């Protein structure tokens, strides 16, 4: 199935409540899930605008075999996207017959609403906020390459490498074909906002991982040395797992758990492309994993990134309207699960270091979960100071919460995120 047909299928599924955008994208069997997800999200964001243009241009009356959802995707690509990919084939020819009329109707809509930019046609809640202006962060996959080789490749393509950034202001100022190394994150390259690398040969070969800046924190802060045994408790879609494997240099073992079979299948493809060979995937509930199982007796490190409200993820608003402000009932349920998962992780007998992370902004899912878990294990574990140079710290809701990290588009040029590093307290002998 081609990109445009796959995107139309996802839009139809969302409209008929068959699932969320992300879930339907992962179950679509389309190979490039990032590309498909981006196209669906942008088409959905402009849905009302596209409906108006298609109706006023009479496109569906003229092309009676053209399905509405496919028409919406194609018109988005023609008028608002990057143009037809791979030449566009018959769809480019079909839309070409109506191109002048569609462009005229879009221009007429702007005049009618008194705006000059496409973005200004959106409802306020759908307009790009700070997150849409974030730089493009690209993690170098050290299982397959190194930063120097990647930098040289981009330089040969006409990009200008500016070295390591000295501050976030350097990242904010990026334009054109300039790129930098992140000031705090090793192996993380930074390109201007809206840089599209989904079709780049290094990405397609698994040499690059497109990953949010804050999403790189959990594996980096867990920092398991090569040869370690690690549990990735809620692993899909797999970017953090591949990061762990890179830190391990594929030496050791990662036990990765997730309950969603389709997400695990996509994750297996992602890990194979990234060259990961030290990971054992299991379709299993982490809460049902026995800490006394001999397989896990050498697990010293656990990464726990459980299901959460996603209130720090701007894209979640497209899938779940209101996700930015989850209801008290939903928060209570999520926090209960998160606390059970964290307390369960702390029962693994050889555990030395754990990273707990969420893409939530809510205190109930973050500081409160960590505080309660530590209180249930008095004297056994403590919060470790994490990345002192990181500017955004945990909320001061209990002593030591400043050791936690928070992230946001405004303060750290990333999605909303929370990270806590928990270490076992060594008992004096």
Swiss-Prot record:
The modification Phosphoserine is found at residue 167. It catalyses: cytidine(3782) in 28S rRNA + S-adenosyl-L-methionine = 5-methylcytidine(3782) in 28S rRNA + S-adenosyl-L-homocysteine + H(+). Keywords: Acetylation, Methyltransferase, Nucleus, Phosphoprotein, RNA-binding, rRNA processing, S-adenosyl-L-methionine, Transferase, Williams-Beuren syndrome. One of its GO terms (biological process) is cerebral cortex development. Ubiquitous. Detected in placenta, heart and skeletal muscle. Disulfide bonds: none annotated. Changing residue 308 to S: Abolished methyltransferase activity without affecting nucleolar localization. It is linked to NSUN5 is located in the Williams-Beuren syndrome (WBS) critical region. WBS results from a hemizygous deletion of several genes on chromosome 7q11.23, thought to arise as a consequence of unequal crossing over between highly homologous low-copy repeat sequences flanking the deleted region. Its deletion in WBS results in decreased methylation of the C(5) position of cytosine 3782 (m5C3782) in 28S rRNA. GO terms for cellular component: nucleolus; nucleoplasm. Its EC number is 2.1.1.-. S-adenosyl-L-methionine-dependent methyltransferase that specifically methylates the C(5) position of cytosine 3782 (m5C3782) in 28S rRNA. m5C3782 promotes protein translation without affecting ribosome biogenesis and fidelity. Required for corpus callosum and cerebral cortex development. InterPro entries: MeTrfase_RsmB-F_NOP2_cat (IPR049560), MeTrfase_RsmB-F_NOP2_dom (IPR001678), NSUN5_7_fdxn-like (IPR049561), NSUN5_RCM1_N (IPR048889), RCMT (IPR023267), SAM-dependent_MTases_sf (IPR029063). It is an enzyme of class 2 (transferase). CDD domains: AdoMet_MTases. The modification N-acetylglycine is found at residue 2. It is found in: Nucleus, Nucleolus. GO terms for molecular function: RNA binding; rRNA (cytosine-C5-)-methyltransferase activity. The active site is at 359 (nucleophile). This is 28S rRNA (cytosine-C(5))-methyltransferase. Belongs to the class I-like SAM-binding methyltransferase superfamily. RsmB/NOP family. Pfam families: Methyltr_RsmB-F (PF01189), NSUN5_fdxn-like (PF21148), NSUN5_N (PF21153). PANTHER family: 28S RRNA (CYTOSINE-C(5))-METHYLTRANSFERASE, NOP2 YEAST -RELATED NOL1/NOP2/FMU SUN DOMAIN-CONTAINING. S-adenosyl-L-methionine binds at residues 234-240, 258, 263, 305.
